[in-house]
């Protein structure tokens, strides 16, 4: 089994009204009142990571010999490296909402939030430990969709590949990150010799001199969901960072709950050099 998303969810709560509960586990549910479930996420999508890289480089040079003993070289180098990476990630609020499945009036599995948009869903240990719900094991905040709008697709966690394609599509999202690195280099070099002071030196005076200008920049743009930006369809205000809604939360695509940022930078430098050769000794 291959999946780009490899991880596991620990201490997921299965409630007694979950219609996907296997009959073999019903006696345990009747005795305890709930189940604690651990699940690897290997069968929730089959999307691999994709990387597209493109390098463009233009180099030009010119050599000029103003006289027999002097040469001037000019060179310019312009390069751009672009990378686009795509990977699939689980959206935590959607996953927990899809896991919190009940039966509707006709006995069909549905998300609890479709019947009660104010319902709080249970989260697992890792999300709790990293402050997903501000300290509790339940959350009533839906960040990437609006509960009750019919989007939520119930997820069957029991068995390999038990989750329906609709549930897989609902709980996952394709994320795109883009990186661009640009470089510009310009240099001029002159070398030659002067046949002077012949009575004092054992040959002509040689020289080499030059100047180089270098400008480099990079720009790394993360997917808005990776940045914790609330998407269209959220039950809150789209386009704002999730921490403005829940101050304890910075993202909803991983357990880390670490705020991510776009990064960029640039620098330029100018180097000048000069050398001289004096043939003092024969």
Features from the language model and the residues they span:
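Surface-exposed, low-complexity loop segments enriched in small/polar and acidic residues
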Residues: 1-269
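Structured alpha-helical segments in the cores of large, soluble enzyme domains
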Residues: 62, 268-281
């Amino acid at each position: 089994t291959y999946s780009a998303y490899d991880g596991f969810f620990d201490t997921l709560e299965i409630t007694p009204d979950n219609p996907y509960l296997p009959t073999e586990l019903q006696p345990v549910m009747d005795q305890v009142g709930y189940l604690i479930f651990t699940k690897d996420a290997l069968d929730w999508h089959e999307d691999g990571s994709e990387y597209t890289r493109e390098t463009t480089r233009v180099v030009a040079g010119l050599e000029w010999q103003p006289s027999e003993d002097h040469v001037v070289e000019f060179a310019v180098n312009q390069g751009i490296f672009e990378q686009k990476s795509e990977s699939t990630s689980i959206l935590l609020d959607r996953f927990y909402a899809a896991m919190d499945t009940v039966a509707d009036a006709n006995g069909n599995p549905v998300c609890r939030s479709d019947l009660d948009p104010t319902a709080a869903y249970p989260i697992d240990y890792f999300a709790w430990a990293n402050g997903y719900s501000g300290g509790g094991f339940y959350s009533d905040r839906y960040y990437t969709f609006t509960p009750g709008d019919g989007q939520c697709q119930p997820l069957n966690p029991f068995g390999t590949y038990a989750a329906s394609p609709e549930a897989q599509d609902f709980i996952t999202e394709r994320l795109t990150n883009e990186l661009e690195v640009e470089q510009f280099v310009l240099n001029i070099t002159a070398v030659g010799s002067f046949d002077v002071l012949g009575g004092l030196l054992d040959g002509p005076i040689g020289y080499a001199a030059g100047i180089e200008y270098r400008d480099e920049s990079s720009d790394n743009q993360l997917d808005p969901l990776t940045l914790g930006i609330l998407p269209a369809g959220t039950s809150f205000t789209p386009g704002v960072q999730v921490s403005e809604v829940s101050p304890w939360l910075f993202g909803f695509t991983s357990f880390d709950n670490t705020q991510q940022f776009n990064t960029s930078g640039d620098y330029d430098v100018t180097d000048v050099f000069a050398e001289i050769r004096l043939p003092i000794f024969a």
